[in-house]
Amino acid sequence: MMAFRAYIINFVILCILVASTVSGYNQKDVKAWCSQTPNPKPCEYFLTHNSNNEPIKSESEFLKISMKLVLDRAILAKTHAFTLGPKCRDTREKAAWEDCIKLYDLTVSKINETMDPNVKCSKLDAQTWLSTALTNLDTCRAGFLELGVTDIVLPLMSNNVSNLLCNTLAINKVPFNYTPPEKDGFPSWVKPGDRKLLQSSTPKDNAVVAKDGSGNFKTIKEAIDAASGSGRFVIYVKQGVYSENLEIRKKNVMLRGDGIGKTIITGSKSVGGGTTTFNSATVAAVGDGFIARGITFRNTAGASNEQAVALRSGSDLSVFYQCSFEAYQDTLYVHSNRQFYRDCDVYGTVDFIFGNAAAVLQNCNIFARRPRSKTNTITAQGRSDPNQNTGIIIHNSRVTAASDLRPVLGSTKTYLGRPWRQYSRTVFMKTSLDSLIDPRGWLEWDGNFALKTLFYAEFQNTGPGASTSGRVTWPGFRVLGSASEASKFTVGTFLAGGSWIPSSVPFTSGL
């Protein structure tokens, strides 16, 4: 009996010792710091169950701890997501699950990037990459919802990572008009040789694609697969129609075509055909630093097949110059990270410029096409957290009717946008709005959803559709009254474009 009591006493002592080693950070400290976040409960739970128990001395230290915490949870969530594959009952569930695996992988990568001591990461960079990580998780959930397969796999996916990401965004929060130090017109990761290459209007090509066999490759995919090294890899795609679905994961790839309507990349995937919006893209730019010039991106699924993306970009610091994007619903998916579009054409019907990037379209032509219903919506911005530094900015552009819409203008309403997510942010500045724009300007998504929390603004637009006298009176809509207000949404400030847009691509930094 004495031996048994000794065993019990030793066991209790061992439990106390083990508990002390995993008791986590000081509970009083944790409560004080976590109370400053939008989601204090998961913050408190995971910190008090962490193996560390040193005092948290500063906000920067709290941010690092929170980053490590969300990274650990994201890795666990990614591992868990892999195990859910066998639970998928059909091809639609499998399609949504496969997207989630990719998106969790990208999420872990982006969080890692913010913490990597070998990667230069300003507060603005961190806010961008954390915003992207949260967008990836939102996109994962959206895939199940849009395919109508939410009852088996989706409930098994935890929201803890999303909540912890929201916390890190709040801790790291960058003032909205934050502008990083000026560089010499290029980002720090572009080497001197690449800078010279990008300054040339006719860059030296690393590979040539031609359908007639006159190049190094007959398909664009073959050329991308051959891309090597960490520097800029320029692929010249000769005139022709290339029926390919491409996911470009390599960094610093440039596709150079012969011009809009000459070099055409086309596909036909769609939600109606059983894929997710995310995976329907004819071309998906994933690797950072992607550049396209003189190319038409097209999805031919048609208006009846619902969402069908021509181009999706999640490439940070990506540039599209003199390109066109052609489809119907969800044409241009500005998914995440920082993106710039100059002298481009965009064609579509419903939500045809959408996503949650920090995206500026400058000097572009936006063509509304004839919809299946009687309603067009140009934008659907997807900002889900108030601290994400994202939004869609249309600057110095033109919004008009495509040729197929003109005969039915009288019976079709076209709106500047509608709020896809709670904190949707869209601005039209110094843009010509033709008479197709409904006097209300903007459309509800679902009743009163997001009308108080969205940020929709207009500044010095022109044309018959530009009058703001009949615009919506939502709390989140405003007409910007001064250049200082509007300048927050220019390329120079919103994208810090002067520090990374290649000098070979013209852009207007201010208003």
Swiss-Prot record:
Its main location: secreted. It holds the Pfam family PMEI. It catalyses: [(1->4)-alpha-D-galacturonosyl methyl ester](n) + n H2O = [(1->4)-alpha-D-galacturonosyl](n) + n methanol + n H(+). Residues 1-23 form the signal peptide. Disulfide bonds join C344-C364. Residues 24-171 are annotated as: Pectinesterase inhibitor 17. Glycans are attached at N112, N160. The record marks Q329 as: Transition state stabilizer. GO terms for biological process: cell wall modification; defense response to Gram-negative bacterium; pectin catabolic process; response to bacterium; response to fungus. Pathway: Glycan metabolism; pectin degradation; 2-dehydro-3-deoxy-D-gluconate from pectin: step 1/5. One of its GO terms (molecular function) is pectinesterase activity. PANTHER family: PECTINESTERASE. This is Probable pectinesterase/pectinesterase inhibitor 17. It comes from Arabidopsis thaliana.
